[in-house]
Amino acid sequence: MEPGLWLLFGLTVTSAAGLVPCPQPGDAGKSGVPGTPPTARSEGDIQEPVAMTAVQGPSPRSPEQEQELGRFGEQASKGGPVHGRARRCTCFTYKDKECVYYCHLDIIWINTPEQTVPYGLSNYRGSFRGRRSTGLFPQSPQPSKWTQRCACVQSQDSACLHFCTRTLAVSRNSRTATNPDKEEEPASRGNGGLRPTR
């Protein structure tokens, strides 16, 4: 067991020796490294500029990266933690799995024998039941075949707007194609379809 302790001690010392404290703007004379000329420093201090660069953080971001942070991490401007992936839009129902996969990029799906459970939709604003509507919107008196399935976070995100409006009509058509007997059953009774014999 003693060699294991020595190994742990050696790794601890090695990792601690590689850390160099980053001087803060108000810490003029408080840094741990004395201000000696470069010739008087020891051999271990040669790596200091590299370590200081690593501790100070990455170089300034490009405009594309700043735009991505603005799009996906609104907390960045508020000083909060920035997550690499965030939601693109908010689905109106959990049952629309395609929408949940599209909108909530950081979703984790847990498979259970009974059902697939969504986990991680903490900021979901809809109800668990699917929306029922006749297709009429208050602003348009005629029936609409394009109903919204989600609400985009950014109003300028044309791909998201296209997905949230167009794809719902496609999924409705595919649903009737997968279950044609539910749609045709009432129609066959009215058209003189199969009737029970007396």
UniProtKB/Swiss-Prot annotation:
Position of the signal peptide: 1-16
InterPro entries xrefs: Endothelin, Endothelin_toxin_CS, Endothln-like_toxin
Region Disordered: start-end pairs: 22-79, 174-198
Annotated segments matching region Endothelin-like: 150-164
UniProt superkingdom: Eukaryota
Molecular function via GO: endothelin B receptor binding; hormone activity
Disulphide bridges, residue numbers: C89-C103, C91-C99
Compartment(s): Secreted
One Pfam family matching this protein: Endothelin
Similarity field: Belongs to the endothelin/sarafotoxin family.
Name recorded for this polypeptide: Endothelin-3
Gene that produces this protein: EDN3
